[in-house]
Amino acid sequence: MSAIFKIIHETSSKFMDSILREGKLLTSNNLNKKFLTDSPKGQGSKDRKLCDSEESIKNKEHFWKHCDEADGVYFRILEMDTPLKTYAGDIILVFSKDMLYKYSWILNTTENFGFYISSPGFEGESQFSGEIGTTYTLDTLKDMDVSSFDPYSSELCVFNNVSLKFLKEIYVREPAFEDLQLSVRALNKYSNAPVIIF
């Protein structure tokens, strides 16, 4: 991923303690096992039917009937100069692109709940939205036309738990900062990421 983009994950102060205890962001399936009654805000729903991301290629015609979301950790891609704002929580975690060389993932140019839109690098139609888009992997990312890429419509789905050692910055809404101060001290064993109030 080019240095002109940042990779972000949104969460809430309520669940930051759990993230710090684990030392990583958990995939949807692992989250559901840990939080049987209450899933972290901004990280999917415990009621979604999870499937392997490649199910959309193996069973293209019918997978959407029994799959709601691919199992993974979800991120948004933003241009570097985009002002940060929260949609589902009060904390934004900014991650290093170095994690893309550590884990298995796909980048969809239009939302498709973490499933492949088509074979990597080839344009196709999102099975959920009907929008035209392309799925990229590490091997095909070099072929992406960045000039026509709209990061705000895209989704990045990582198929592994993601270590906090790849964390670069933490942005916290001011009302949540007081509650978070003690928790963030625990972050030092994973990362030296600065905490920024916004």
From Swiss-Prot:
Pfam families, per this entry? DUF5863 (PF19181)
Q: What InterPro entries does UniProt report for this protein, alphabetically?
A: DUF5863
Q: What's this protein's name? A: Uncharacterized protein 422L
What is the species of this protein?
A: Invertebrate iridescent virus 6 (IIV-6)
